[in-house]
């Protein structure tokens, strides 16, 4: 249930600050969002997959913490990221 290498490379190209940027907050949030969206599609078919649902909740919590950090440190980058990903907040 992980993302393909091509999907990760596309996210890195879209959200990374430079070519090899894999650790910036924007990239981490974008990767988590893609994984969360992938898992949501999985749960439409597999409703009772509680083991994976726990992992989904962990990813959502991690994304929430990262977006809160970004909002606290750089509001302009936060608002740009939220608009680009289409997240609520």
UniProtKB/Swiss-Prot annotation:
Gene assigned in the entry: rpsO
Signal peptide start and end residues: none
Keywords of this entry: Ribonucleoprotein, Ribosomal protein, RNA-binding, rRNA-binding
Gene Ontology cellular-component annotations: cytosolic small ribosomal subunit
InterPro entries the record matches: Ribosomal_uS15 (IPR000589), Ribosomal_uS15_bac-type (IPR005290), uS15_NS1_RNA-bd_sf (IPR009068)
Protein family membership: Belongs to the universal ribosomal protein uS15 family.
NCBIfam families documented for this protein: S15_bact
Subunit-level organization: Part of the 30S ribosomal subunit. Forms a bridge to the 50S subunit in the 70S ribosome, contacting the 23S rRNA.
Known function: One of the primary rRNA binding proteins, it binds directly to 16S rRNA where it helps nucleate assembly of the platform of the 30S subunit by binding and bridging several RNA helices of the 16S rRNA. Forms an intersubunit bridge (bridge B4) with the 23S rRNA of the 50S subunit in the ribosome.
Protein name in UniProt: Small ribosomal subunit protein uS15
Annotated source species: Shewanella baltica (strain OS185)
Protein origin, superkingdom: Bacteria
